[in-house]
Structures are given as structure tokens and as C-alpha cells.
Amino acid sequence: MLVNSLIVILSVIAMEGIAAFTHRYIMHGWGWRWHESHHTPRKGVFELNDLFAVVFAGVAIALIAVGTAGVWPLQWIGCGMTVYGLLYFLVHDGLVHQRWPFHWIPRRGYLKRLYVAHRLHHAVRGREGCVSFGFIYARKPADLQAILRERHGRPPKRDAAKDRPDAASPSSSSPE
């Protein structure tokens, strides 16, 4: 039981690295055709980008199936992927992109840091020059803003972190 729990926890942690890599090099690379829908105004309930969730869920289901058929660690790795997917769904789709019927914007703490970091990711038009590709771990918003200024030679014209009044000042109440 303890080993299984440890595998799940380590899988969730590993998924952050895998998700950041996938987001940066696949979604902003050859998978941009799907992911671009996530960087443009949404029309309707779903985005083409949602197909990535279906693919990742398929991998998790396959791991759980193979694991329950005899390769026991795989079911717990699949479980860890599922937990990460749930966290991603709650925070990314619910909190940041407000794809749910309720709308809440964090005003302080780590959730605000996640919120602002992802909004800064969307501050750049297109797939090049973005920051913050992971989601459970987020750098300080001030650091991300400095990277954006360095990459673009100016603050981004579209600073998505300032689209909402309570996210306007990421350095004022963001955790250090």
C-alpha cells in the first residue's frame, strides 16, 4: 500500500515534467494545429486542444489495464497520471480559463501564482516566445515578465495577466 501510494505521488510529480516537455515541444511544435485552438478565443464548449486530454487519458487507461493484468506498477503510474489530469482539469480549465459556470480569481498565494503564470503564457500571440509551460510548478510572475521582456525587447503588447483587475499586479501579492 505504501509503495503504491509512493508510485502515485512520484507519478504526479513526474507528470509535471512530462506535461511541461509535451506542452513546450509537442503542443507548441508539431502539435500546434490542435493546441492553437487553446490560444485563440473559444467558440463553443470544446476546443480542438481538448483532444490532447483524450490522448493522455487513453495512455492512463492503457497503463491501468496492463497494470491490473499483471504488471502491477503500471496501474499505479496510470493512477498518478489520472490524478495529475484531475488537478490540471480543476486548476487549468476551471480556475484559469474559467470553463466552468462559477468564476473565481485567486487574489494571493500559490493559486494566484499559477493563475498569473499561465496568463503570462498566453500573453504572447502564436507559439513562439512563450513562458511557463508546466502547471503545478510556476515561477514567480516577476521572473516570467522579465523573460518576456528579454525575449521580445519590450513588455508584451498583450499582457494577459492584466486582463483582470485582481491579477493586475502579480508582484504585489504573489508568493516569493
Swiss-Prot record:
Q: Which Pfam families match?
A: FA_hydroxylase (PF04116)
Q: What is its EC number?
A: 1.-.-.-
Q: Which UniProt keywords apply?
A: Carotenoid biosynthesis, Oxidoreductase
Feature: compositional bias, Low complexity: 167-176
Q: Do you know which InterPro entries this protein is assigned to?
A: BETA-OHASE-like, Fatty_acid_hydroxylase
Molecular function terms from GO: beta-carotene 3-hydroxylase activity; iron ion binding
Annotated GO biological process: carotene metabolic process; xanthophyll biosynthetic process
Task: Give me the ranges of the annotated region Disordered.
Answer: 152-176
Limits of the Fatty acid hydroxylase domain: 10-126
Pathway listed for it is: Carotenoid biosynthesis; zeaxanthin biosynthesis
Q: Where is the composition biased (Basic and acidic residues)?
A: 156-166
Physiological role: Catalyzes the hydroxylation reaction from beta-carotene to zeaxanthin.
PANTHER family per the UniProt record, alphabetical: BETA-CAROTENE 3-HYDROXYLASE 1, CHLOROPLASTIC (PTHR31899:SF9)
Q: Which family does it belong to?
A: Belongs to the sterol desaturase family.
**Name of the molecule in the record:** Beta-carotene hydroxylase
Tell me the organism.
Answer: Pseudescherichia vulneris (Escherichia vulneris)
